[in-house]
């Protein structure tokens, strides 16, 4: 079934010039970082500037490009308009807390609201990014569960803001009095955390609007043709719909293509299994752009390897057709050699006459 359907590419993403935010996510171990890196490379060929951000604590982006990245945008070697950065999705509590006896109180307040630390960290990062002039920003996200929490950050921060407003109205100047007791009035007051959240409010509202705008934001799901990955992809697509975040591209990675030369029973069995799930992907997501990528015998690391693999994102991969073309050319060469040999023998007979 899947083999009969036309192959899609990620060209539609490159053609959508209004896109500002591109998220790449999926189950762990499916090749998200490789796909997000190559997608950023493809976008850099048609955009004035591209920034790729890793929000995965594992930070595989440096490994993919074989270049050290930090929490500040760094120019990727070999490019003039592609930048990369790796950020910690959890807030640095040392930056948030006071000193001496107050840091425990501050931490308790921050931790009292589930997810507030990650949400504030992500909002601060977006606030920084928005001050920079990048045409498109690609997110290499953590596995599905972390990604969904990340996408909830606007609601989490709004909830945190309302809770702290409620605390302020109920307890008045209690926190200010406590800060005076510790001699920290200048460093910590009742409005410290509240002020920080309010400072992010405009960013939250603006980004939330942009994330829900299909002209500005899209989510690319990366998966492999196996049951658990199919399940995670469906869960992700359903959750994205709840968040009103556009998604219309799926990349199916590590596909084994049918090859007449394959004799291994194990590979044949894996091909049959993959084909079953490929059919299900095409049935479930018949209105999506589905890009299939082959399983390679080696890892794709380093700029040159990423660039070499990038053409498979824009041109459907057809190994059978390629093999047939090569075999046809080889047959033609063999025939011409035979004809040349026959002609040379005929020429020798004529000469010896």
Swiss-Prot record:
<keyword id="KW-0963">Cytoplasm</keyword>
<feature type="binding site">
    <location>
        <position position="226"/>
    </location>
    <ligand>
        <name>ATP</name>
    </ligand>
</feature>
<feature type="binding site">
    <location>
        <begin position="27"/>
        <end position="34"/>
    </location>
    <ligand>
        <name>ATP</name>
    </ligand>
</feature>
<dbReference type="GO" id="GO:0016887">
    <property type="term" value="F:ATP hydrolysis activity"/>
</dbReference>
<dbReference type="InterPro" id="IPR027417">
    <property type="entry name" value="P-loop_NTPase"/>
</dbReference>
<dbReference type="GO" id="GO:0045048">
    <property type="term" value="P:protein insertion into ER membrane"/>
</dbReference>
<feature type="active site">
    <location>
        <position position="56"/>
    </location>
</feature>
<dbReference type="GO" id="GO:0005829">
    <property type="term" value="C:cytosol"/>
</dbReference>
<keyword id="KW-0547">Nucleotide-binding</keyword>
<keyword id="KW-0175">Coiled coil</keyword>
<dbReference type="InterPro" id="IPR016300">
    <property type="entry name" value="ATPase_ArsA/GET3"/>
</dbReference>
<keyword id="KW-0256">Endoplasmic reticulum</keyword>
<dbReference type="InterPro" id="IPR027542">
    <property type="entry name" value="ATPase_ArsA/GET3_euk"/>
</dbReference>
<keyword id="KW-0378">Hydrolase</keyword>
<dbReference type="GO" id="GO:0048767">
    <property type="term" value="P:root hair elongation"/>
</dbReference>
<feature type="coiled-coil region">
    <location>
        <begin position="320"/>
        <end position="353"/>
    </location>
</feature>
<keyword id="KW-0067">ATP-binding</keyword>
<keyword id="KW-0813">Transport</keyword>
<protein>
    <recommendedName>
        <fullName>ATPase GET3A</fullName>
        <ecNumber>3.6.-.-</ecNumber>
    </recommendedName>
</protein>
<feature type="binding site">
    <location>
        <position position="253"/>
    </location>
    <ligand>
        <name>ATP</name>
    </ligand>
</feature>
<comment type="function">
    <text>ATPase required for the post-translational delivery of tail-anchored (TA) proteins to the endoplasmic reticulum. Recognizes and selectively binds the transmembrane domain of TA proteins in the cytosol. This complex then targets to the endoplasmic reticulum by membrane-bound receptors, where the tail-anchored protein is released for insertion. This process is regulated by ATP binding and hydrolysis. ATP binding drives the homodimer towards the closed dimer state, facilitating recognition of newly synthesized TA membrane proteins. ATP hydrolysis is required for insertion.</text>
</comment>
<dbReference type="InterPro" id="IPR025723">
    <property type="entry name" value="Anion-transp_ATPase-like_dom"/>
</dbReference>
<dbReference type="GO" id="GO:0005524">
    <property type="term" value="F:ATP binding"/>
</dbReference>
<dbReference type="Pfam" id="PF02374">
    <property type="entry name" value="ArsA_ATPase"/>
</dbReference>
<dbReference type="GO" id="GO:0043529">
    <property type="term" value="C:GET complex"/>
</dbReference>
<dbReference type="GO" id="GO:0005576">
    <property type="term" value="C:extracellular region"/>
</dbReference>
<comment type="subunit">
    <text>Homodimer. Interacts with GET1 and GET4.</text>
</comment>
<comment type="similarity">
    <text>Belongs to the arsA ATPase family.</text>
</comment>
């Amino acid at each position: 079934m899947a083999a009969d359907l036309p192959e899609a590419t990620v060209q539609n993403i490159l053609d959508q010039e209004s896109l500002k935010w591109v998220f790449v996510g999926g189950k762990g171990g499916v090749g998200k970082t490789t796909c997000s890196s190559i997608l950023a490379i493809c976008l850099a060929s048609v955009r004035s500037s591209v920034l790729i951000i890793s929000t995965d604590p594992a930070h595989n982006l440096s490994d993919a490009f074989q270049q050290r990245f930090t929490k500040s945008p760094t120019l990727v070697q070999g490019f003039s308009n592609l930048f990369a950065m790796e950020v910690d999705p959890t807030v640095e509590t040392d930056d948030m807390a006071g000193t001496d006896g107050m840091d425990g109180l501050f931490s308790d307040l921050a931790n009292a609201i589930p997810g507030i630390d990650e949400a504030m960290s992500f909002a601060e990062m977006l606030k920084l990014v928005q001050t920079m002039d990048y045409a498109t920003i690609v997110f290499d996200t953590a596995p599905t569960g972390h990604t969904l929490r990340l996408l909830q950050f606007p609601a989490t921060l709004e909830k945190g803001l309302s809770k702290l407003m409620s605390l302020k109205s109920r307890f008045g100047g209690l926190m200010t009095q406590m800060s005076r007791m510790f001699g920290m009035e200048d460093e910590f007051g009742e409005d410290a955390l509240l002020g920080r959240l309010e400072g992010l409010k405009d960013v939250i509202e603006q980004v939330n609007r942009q994330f829900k705008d299909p002209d500005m934001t899209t989510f690319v799901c990366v998966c492999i043709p196996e049951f658990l990955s199919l399940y995670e992809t469906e869960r992700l697509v359903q959750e994205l719909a709840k968040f009103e975040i556009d998604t219309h591209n799926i990349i199916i990675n590590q596909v084994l293509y049918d090859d007449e030369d394959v004799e291994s029973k194990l590979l044949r069995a894996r091909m049959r299994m993959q084909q079953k799930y490929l059919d299900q992907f095409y049935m479930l997501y018949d209105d999506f752009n589905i890009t299939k990528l082959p399983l390679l015998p080696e890892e794709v690391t380093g700029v040159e390897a990423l660039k070499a693999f990038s053409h498979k994102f824009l041109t459907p991969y057809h190994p059978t057709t390629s093999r047939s073309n090569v075999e046809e050319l080889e047959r033609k060469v063999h025939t011409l050699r035979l004809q040349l040999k026959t002609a040379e023998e005929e020429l020798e007979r004529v000469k010896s006459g």
